[in-house]
């Protein structure tokens, strides 16, 4: 894209303005359009020239606009920015290749002003598609789709962003028009500051989300960005690099015992949802009420053909293989799910505070949420101490008491604990224990110093405990 700085009076639909006298085709009663920060323009020529310090032109000058010694910076014969950027357009004649643009005799002055870049709209309204398929617009609408003043021919415009211009014919624009087989996605009111260069009329912002109602295949984000998606890429081509969701595939590994082949093959049917897999296993493999043999034939099942007494128990067991957990916790924010309804019932008591299991020992008022906790508590009232320490043979009524006791052995050395005979490994490495037994004259500080410099031993002796 070629950027041209112009300090002279601007004419909509014409080419590059310049300093100097008005051109020969200027209409006598027309005031120059105000282009500066004043959106309403000025009636004097001096104010218009000062306001139009710079302009950002998106279309080249026409042959009618340029004099015999001038050429446009957008044409390939220009030796300025156009040739430096390598722009080549087939719309111009090759016999101007040696000409140098003069820009109205003030080429150097036209590039002296480097401030106040403004977007200007050449005109308002829509025109029919110009002949020759080389006209393209900025993202959606072409620059030539806007009317120029009466009596001045339409200039061709060029592609600014290749790759985004391909659009299949027949798609209406959000405003109900099709220009150059391209959909206009609301850029006309957003890109330019004024809707009409001749009257002080504000250009309302178009709603990009309103266009999505007319285009169900385009998302609101596509409409807002004004991107034309190529017809052969489909509506989602703009987001084709986004990661697609991974499709879940669940396989049935049930092995039918009626197979005659060896080795027997599993079902291997795949399903996209857990509901489909469970329905398939229940209906086709487990069977109905007429089935008397409730055996799990899932591949590598640890039960190895052992039968269940009831069908519901087999169904609950199959959830171990399928991973189904159909019982979620109904309390907000919990998020836990369970495979068995009994486990959900017990879990819900943690939210409600219900403790239906009372201690059966007379005089004890302790209550518990589940029967297993009550059973552990009952050992307090009886002489039964089933939790025995393997190091010192002490027994406890509750497993938590045994865990607290084991921390005592972790802090002791191998000299005072018969760890080797009890099945527990010593918390002190054998090398340290042998060194302490051989050299009894050293103080504990000396032993600590000698062991701290051994690079082959970890500083934390608890790592040796299993």
Curated annotation (Swiss-Prot):
Skewed-composition ranges (Low complexity): 411-427
Top-rank taxon: Eukaryota
Location within or outside the cell: Nucleus; Cytoplasm
UniProt note on tissues of expression: CNS. A high level expression is seen in the cerebellum.
Region (Disordered): 65-103, 403-466
GO biological process: anterior/posterior pattern specification; atrial cardiac muscle tissue development; axial mesoderm development; central nervous system segmentation; cranial skeletal system development; determination of digestive tract left/right asymmetry; determination of left/right asymmetry in nervous system; determination of left/right symmetry
GO MF entries: DNA-binding transcription activator activity, RNA polymerase II-specific; DNA-binding transcription factor activity; RNA polymerase II cis-regulatory region sequence-specific DNA binding; RNA polymerase II transcription regulatory region sequence-specific DNA binding; sequence-specific DNA binding; transcription coactivator activity; zinc ion binding
Key words of the record: Activator, Cytoplasm, Developmental protein, Differentiation, DNA-binding, Isopeptide bond, Metal-binding, Neurogenesis, Nucleus, Repeat, Transcription, Transcription regulation, Ubl conjugation, Zinc, Zinc-finger
Short sequence motif Nuclear localization signal: positions: 296-321, 329-351
Composition skew (Polar residues), residue ranges: 65-80, 434-454
Cross-link (Glycyl lysine isopeptide (Lys-Gly) (interchain with G-Cter in SUMO2)): 247
Knockout-associated phenotype: Some mice exhibit embryonic and postnatal lethality. Viable mice show heart disease, disturbances of laterality, neural tube defects and vertebral and rib defects.
InterPro entries: GLI-like, Znf-C2H2_ZIC1-5/GLI1-3-like, Znf_C2H2_sf, Znf_C2H2_type, Znf_ZIC
Basic residues bias: start-end ranges: 86-97
Family membership noted in the UniProt record: Belongs to the GLI C2H2-type zinc-finger protein family.
Notes concerning its domains: The C2H2-type 3, 4 and 5 zinc finger domains are necessary for transcription activation.
Database matches in PANTHER family: TRANSCRIPTIONAL ACTIVATOR CUBITUS INTERRUPTUS
Assembly and oligomerization: Interacts with KPNA1 and KPNA6. Interacts (via C2H2-type domains 3, 4 and 5) with GLI3; the interaction enhances its transcriptional activity. Interacts (via the C2H2-type domains 3, 4 and 5) with MDFIC (via the C2H2-type domains 3, 4 and 5); the interaction reduces its transcriptional activity.
Protein name: Zinc finger protein ZIC 3
Classification of source organism: Eukaryota, Metazoa, Chordata, Craniata, Vertebrata
